[in-house]
Amino acid sequence: MASPLDFGIADNELTSYVTPDCQSIIPISRTASLRSSVQWGDIPIPVSIFHSTYKVNSSAYIGELPYATETEIERNTKRYACAVTALFSVAGRLYLNGKPLITATSMFGQLPDWNEYISIWSATNTTTAYIKNGIEYGSTKSNDLGPGFVSYCNNKGYNLQESHAGAPIFEQFKQQIANNCNSIFTAQAISNGSTVGHSMAVAGWVDATRTPGNDPAVGHSYLYVYDGWNGMSYIDYNYPVFTYTFVTFFSG
């Protein structure tokens, strides 16, 4: 598994490959400097930790996302890009004529449509950032993510629209979830002096407070996402080390 420091983003339009450390830890304090360095793998909060540490005040979900793990993707496609992985998951949630547009998970004994991963890679103009141990790790320009995926879906007979913008507000995600629509959240953070980004498919939102004994006891906004590596997680939407955020909303 590659280090999250192997490749850094060159500008605000690139989403690089990053991967977490093997161990998950409690997120750093919200009082951290806005430009503190952090490992991207430390940012997602595992579901088990979240529900044992936070009290949910309000929430809404579109349901669980079908997903393939990074290990599965690398083994079967010899590629990995976080934006493509997020879109692959979204494609598995779209239905055409009563059937999923693609199979995006191996859960329940299913066989993912790995060729579709490559097709989404091509449609979004994802480029190879580097090759390690025979695996191509890719980067996707944020502005190509939505239009490329719309083109991919339209070519398969599914009518999809998209919109995208930098610095989205949390209320926009709440409206998307209320409309049962898909979103991709992209964020950048400083990691050992380099700007490293990551894209994740969104499945819900949560307003939560830390449980007694876990300060601060104020409500915060979280997104429920497929972390792009191993499973569903929560992301603090106002995480102090994010230097840039970007959203792609889909409808249809």
Model-derived segments and their meaning:
Residues 5, 38, 60, 95, ...:
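Generic detector of intrinsically disordered, low-complexity, polar/charged segments
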